[in-house]
């Protein structure tokens, strides 16, 4: 028997129900914030991610699915969504005008890492990207969008925020941090590698010993220039004004190299201690890194599998929907197919092609979470009627076929 690859799973039944629920909710909120849909390829040139995600990241260093294709191109399956969207923005020359572009996306991402709960090698993300707006109020709106999504999904969270500074204040901080790191011994191999490529990423290390060495490290948000400090204060003010609780985490740097200024992360204890369920921030330098005109960008990505895991723990009852249409004798099935075809213009209809007793049909309708049950037997056929039962309200009656649209 051929099985799915390790760390990759099929999406069906209850998982598919929750996936659709999450995506529908995210899309509705994103559209309310003025975002439109974009879809980028699953396969990109490796150079895109080496230049955007960064050589110091675990993604580029350890986790990319990469290979040489038949055209001798060095390609990889996309490990994250932002770089591809930025590439599309530049390729379509949208970086050359001054208009603001706001996009949302969702789909599969691929990373070769150890599979665990809420973390797969093929996983799904929902994300948004906003280009052309330098205002910190756009950063705040992006965060508030996530707050609204989690509110609609009834997911509890903790919001962590930080400022990573800009090209004006970051070089001095970087210099101070390198001096501090050089004064300490015992960092893990990942930290030593990151120290030479992007020392700020050392702060992101999950190794407990490394974290203990960083207890007295210089803090990012205490080395900000006046402009970055002002923006960070405005961000906190907006969140407070909108009733959003948050915590300033001075060691929050995000997992990718392209962030600057605002950085944020949403964590939840509902699927394990401090599990990240979404994160993002500002990445003004990324557009220029990818040969675009210097500009502004901010966005977030949300892990769908982790959200599904939280929703499944809540054991939410799957909502009934649609119509189950059936017959007690196969001679009526062709007529029901005609009825189903007309109903499907406005309704979800599941038509059974098997003639069964009423009780068996009702059992099957229940298994399929149908809301409305319609059945034709001999009496119904003679009277141009159907047996109707609302499986939510438990109402039942005979209805004329001519009255179907009115009743439904």
Swiss-Prot record:
<dbReference type="InterPro" id="IPR004154">
    <property type="entry name" value="Anticodon-bd"/>
</dbReference>
<dbReference type="InterPro" id="IPR006195">
    <property type="entry name" value="aa-tRNA-synth_II"/>
</dbReference>
<keyword id="KW-0030">Aminoacyl-tRNA synthetase</keyword>
<dbReference type="Pfam" id="PF03129">
    <property type="entry name" value="HGTP_anticodon"/>
</dbReference>
<dbReference type="InterPro" id="IPR015807">
    <property type="entry name" value="His-tRNA-ligase"/>
</dbReference>
<protein>
    <recommendedName>
        <fullName>Histidine--tRNA ligase</fullName>
        <ecNumber>6.1.1.21</ecNumber>
    </recommendedName>
</protein>
<dbReference type="GO" id="GO:0005524">
    <property type="term" value="F:ATP binding"/>
</dbReference>
<dbReference type="GO" id="GO:0005737">
    <property type="term" value="C:cytoplasm"/>
</dbReference>
<keyword id="KW-0436">Ligase</keyword>
<dbReference type="GO" id="GO:0006427">
    <property type="term" value="P:histidyl-tRNA aminoacylation"/>
</dbReference>
<comment type="similarity">
    <text>Belongs to the class-II aminoacyl-tRNA synthetase family.</text>
</comment>
<dbReference type="Pfam" id="PF13393">
    <property type="entry name" value="tRNA-synt_His"/>
</dbReference>
<comment type="subunit">
    <text>Homodimer.</text>
</comment>
<keyword id="KW-0067">ATP-binding</keyword>
<keyword id="KW-0648">Protein biosynthesis</keyword>
<dbReference type="GO" id="GO:0004821">
    <property type="term" value="F:histidine-tRNA ligase activity"/>
</dbReference>
<keyword id="KW-0963">Cytoplasm</keyword>
<dbReference type="InterPro" id="IPR036621">
    <property type="entry name" value="Anticodon-bd_dom_sf"/>
</dbReference>
<dbReference type="InterPro" id="IPR045864">
    <property type="entry name" value="aa-tRNA-synth_II/BPL/LPL"/>
</dbReference>
<dbReference type="InterPro" id="IPR041715">
    <property type="entry name" value="HisRS-like_core"/>
</dbReference>
<dbReference type="InterPro" id="IPR004516">
    <property type="entry name" value="HisRS/HisZ"/>
</dbReference>
<keyword id="KW-0547">Nucleotide-binding</keyword>
